[in-house]
């Protein structure tokens, strides 16, 4: 799983976790011939070659229809987008974990409608020129707080009736979040508070963020990477899957550090805290 964060998804996260904003557009820096020449050669045959996620310049194989996709994976092929499961309660978490699926683009906007389209839990792939656009979300109506209050009151009444009739609440409580998931939530909260000026976001604010790469169990993936910056691949390193701390013997490189070779019993034991 590649650990390069898509700027397009970062901005999509802002629209999910922040207030309604107007349409935001920014361009990645252009790729020079020198930077492209420094990219490693592809060792596999690709149905379609695209730029790596984020603002990187190196070529990667695009994901095909039905293949898994997400924040840390190559983008989907032309005509496809990365979607979470339709019934998912946490679509963003699925995309961060790379558990989305590449599917055909679905245009849900009615023809000739002036209403803005609501954002779904999809990864919007940047174009090859580096342009990323995030559709606006519909602002809440004036009576939204009242509706929300009524819904909460209805739920409380229903819960009281269920207790009176000694019926258990069918919804099981959420399991305690892991350290990686807690760190992820903190980063998403920071993203939602980024200030946007003139409908453009300062890329430096996005570059400075590190979104932890969590696996489906909530643990840290062995390989963690920073965003691609100015066409250069982000630095990658290996971490303890339980604590997220760097493995002392692993390197910090712009590429795949092959983290499995640095694993030993100590890193796999959650009770052992590695040295700083």
From Swiss-Prot:
Q: List the disulfide bonds.
A: 28-55, 31-57, 39-58, 46-61, 69-82, 76-102, 180-214, 225-236, 238-259
Domain IGFBP N-terminal, first and last residues per copy: 24-105
Q: Name one GO molecular function term.
A: insulin-like growth factor I binding
Q: Where in the cell is it found?
A: Secreted
InterPro entries from the xrefs? Answer: Growth_fac_rcpt_cys_sf (IPR009030), IGFBP-2 (IPR012210), IGFBP-like (IPR000867), IGFBP_1-6_chordata (IPR022321), Insulin_GF-bd_Cys-rich_CS (IPR017891), Thyroglobulin_1 (IPR000716), Thyroglobulin_1_sf (IPR036857)
User: Which terms does the UniProt entry file under GO BP?
Assistant: angiogenesis; heart development; negative regulation of cell population proliferation; negative regulation of developmental growth; negative regulation of DNA replication; regulation of insulin-like growth factor receptor signaling pathway
Summarize the subunit comment: Interacts equally well with igf1 and igf2.
What stretch of residues is annotated with the motif Cell attachment site? 254-256
**What triggers expression?**
Expression increases in response to prolonged fasting but decreases in response to growth hormone (GH).
Pfam families documented for this protein: IGFBP, Thyroglobulin_1
Q: What does this protein do?
A: IGF-binding proteins prolong the half-life of the IGFs and have been shown to either inhibit or stimulate the growth promoting effects of the IGFs on cell culture. They alter the interaction of IGFs with their cell surface receptors.
Which tissues does it occur in?
Answer: In embryos at 24 hpf, initially expressed in the lens and cranial region, and at 48 and 72 hpf in the brain boundary vasculature. Expression in these regions persists throughout the hatching period and by 96 hpf expression is most abundant in the liver. In both male and female adults, highest expression is in the liver with modest expression in the brain. In male but not females adults, expressed at a low level in muscle and gonad. Also expressed in the adult intestine.
The record ties this protein, via CDD domains, to: TY
Q: Could you tell me which PROSITE patterns the record lists for this protein?
A: IGFBP_N_1 (PS00222), IGFBP_N_2 (PS51323), THYROGLOBULIN_1_1 (PS00484), THYROGLOBULIN_1_2 (PS51162)
Where in the sequence is the signal peptide annotated?
1-22
Identify this protein by name. Answer: Insulin-like growth factor-binding protein 2-A
Every Thyroglobulin type-1 domain range:
177-259
Listed GO CC annotations: extracellular region; extracellular space
């Amino acid at each position: 799983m590649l650990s390069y964060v898509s700027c397009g998804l970062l901005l999509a996260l802002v629209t999910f976790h922040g207030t309604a904003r107007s349409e935001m557009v920014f361009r990645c820096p252009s790729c020079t011939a020198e930077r492209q020449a420094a990219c490693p050669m592809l060792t596999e045959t690709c149905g379609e070659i695209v730029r790596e996620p984020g603002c990187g310049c190196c070529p990667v194989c695009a994901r095909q229809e039905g293949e898994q996709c997400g924040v840390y994976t190559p983008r989907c092929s032309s005509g496809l987008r990365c979607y979470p499961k339709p019934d998912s309660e946490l679509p963003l978490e699925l995309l961060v974990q790379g558990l989305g699926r590449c599917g055909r683009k679905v245009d849900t906007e009615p023809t000739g409608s002036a209403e803005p389209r609501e954002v779904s839990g999809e990864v919007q792939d940047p174009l090859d020129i580096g342009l990323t656009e995030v559709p606006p979300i519909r602002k809440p109506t004036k009576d939204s707080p009242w509706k929300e209050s009524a819904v909460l009151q209805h739920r409380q009444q229903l819960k009281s009736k269920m207790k009176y009739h000694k019926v258990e609440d069918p919804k099981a409580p959420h399991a305690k979040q892991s350290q990686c998931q807690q760190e992820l939530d903190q980063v998403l909260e920071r993203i939602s508070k980024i200030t946007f000026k003139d409908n453009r976001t300062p890329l430096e604010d996005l570059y400075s963020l590190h979104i932890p790469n969590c696996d489906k169990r909530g643990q840290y993936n062995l390989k963690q990477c920073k965003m691609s910056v100015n066409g250069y691949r982000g630095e990658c390193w290996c971490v303890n899957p339980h604590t997220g701390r760097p493995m002392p013997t692993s390197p910090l490189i712009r590429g795949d550090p092959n983290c499995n070779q640095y694993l030993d019993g100590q890193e796999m034991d959650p009770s052992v805290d590695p040295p700083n």
